[in-house]
From Swiss-Prot:
Functional summary from the UniProt entry: This is one of the proteins that binds to the 5S RNA in the ribosome where it forms part of the central protuberance.
Species of the source: Anaeromyxobacter sp. (strain K)
Gene Ontology process terms (BP): translation
Family the UniProt entry places it in: Belongs to the bacterial ribosomal protein bL25 family. CTC subfamily.
Keyword Metal-binding in annotation: no
Gene (UniProt): rplY
Identification of the protein by name: Large ribosomal subunit protein bL25
Assembly and oligomerization: Part of the 50S ribosomal subunit; part of the 5S rRNA/L5/L18/L25 subcomplex. Contacts the 5S rRNA. Binds to the 5S rRNA independently of L5 and L18.
Superkingdom of source: Bacteria
CDD domains given in the database record: Ribosomal_L25_TL5_CTC (cd00495)
Biased composition annotated in UniProt, kind: Low complexity: 204-229
Compositional bias ranges of the Basic and acidic residues kind: 230-240
Length: 240
């Protein structure tokens, strides 16, 4: 991994006020963590930093940070941007030693076309980053996972992956990295028979809107006398 050189100056003032003044001067505050010393507070040019990390490693980019004549090796770890302007406001670095391994997260990239995809399956990446232990200058850009032989319903765990030379995968649980899912079957609704014009409704079914009521038990016409033996609504019983 090639190193990019980044210049910075040490700062003694912290807080919102000094940070605001730095930004007015075209600089941003940054902090260097790690090592056996207290965190180092520095100021640097954001444009220079953005150019320095324009590498495939991005957050795992190894930098040589020069602060007031002294240099140290660092990894770019985190940053803050303005939510409106998207300008860089703050940066964090991790100080490292070139002869001491570090643990970092490295992105996963699949290689090839899974056999299960040809069978109608769906390739899914369950874990997009894996934890790798390596020397700072041996950190891989990505972890390539060959899925060519992966059949439908099968998966690859992190323990089954081959780490790049000089790297180790670190994990407590043997988690799934990629798998080929079985496609879900779509349920087909049963066809509904079309109504035949003029057909009688099924037994117990209500008549269609606007249809005549059945003859049996039909209501009497307006003003007609009730059926024999019946009662007149709202009146006395019929005379015998």
């Amino acid at each position: 991994m090639a190193e990019n050189v980044l210049s910075a100056q040490k700062r003694t003032e912290q807080g919102k006020g000094p940070a605001r003044r730095l930004r007015q001067q075209g600089l941003i505050p940054a902090v260097v963590y790690g090592g056996k010393r207290e965190p180092t507070h520095v100021a640097l040019d954001p444009a220079t930093l953005l150019k320095a990390i324009e590498t495939p490693h991005k957050f795992n980019t190894l930098l040589e940070l020069q602060v007031d004549g002294a240099s140290k090796h660092v990894l770019f770890k985190d940053y803050t941007v303005d939510p409106v302007t998207r300008k860089l406001l703050h940066a964090d670095f991790l100080e490292v030693s070139l002869d001491q391994p570090v643990r970092v997260e490295v992105p996963v990239a699949t290689v090839g076309r899974a056999a299960g995809v040809a069978e109608g399956g769906i390739l899914s990446v369950a874990t997009h980053e894996v934890v790798v232990e390596a020397l700072p200058n041996k950190i891989p850009v990505r972890i390539e996972v060959d899925v060519t032989e992966l059949k439908i319903g099968r998966s690859l765990h992190v323990s089954e992956l081959k780490p790049p030379e000089g790297c180790k995968f670190k994990f407590q649980t043997d988690y799934v990295v990629v798998f080929v899912a079985v496609p879900e079957k779509e349920e087909v609704a049963a066809p509904v028979a079309a109504a035949v014009p003029g057909a009688a409704p099924a037994e117990g079914a209500a008549p269609a809107a606007g249809a005549a009521a059945p003859a049996g038990g039909a209501a009497p016409a307006a003003g007609a006398a009730p059926a024999k033996g019946g009662e007149a609504k709202g009146g006395d019983k019929a005379k015998k």
